[in-house]
Amino acid sequence: LPRHTLHCVAYHGYCFHSKV
């Protein structure tokens, strides 16, 4: 898995990059 994964939060309605 890539370190930078794009997480889309449906219940918040936005996407953010997480360094996991």
UniProtKB/Swiss-Prot annotation:
It comes from the Eukaryota. This is Beta-defensin. The keyword Disulfide bond applies. It comes from Dromaius novaehollandiae (Emu). Keywords: Antibiotic, Antimicrobial, Defensin, Disulfide bond, Secreted. Belongs to the beta-defensin family. Transmembrane segments: none annotated. Its main location: secreted. One of its GO terms (biological process) is defense response to bacterium. Has bactericidal activity. GO terms for cellular component: extracellular region. It is found in: Secreted.
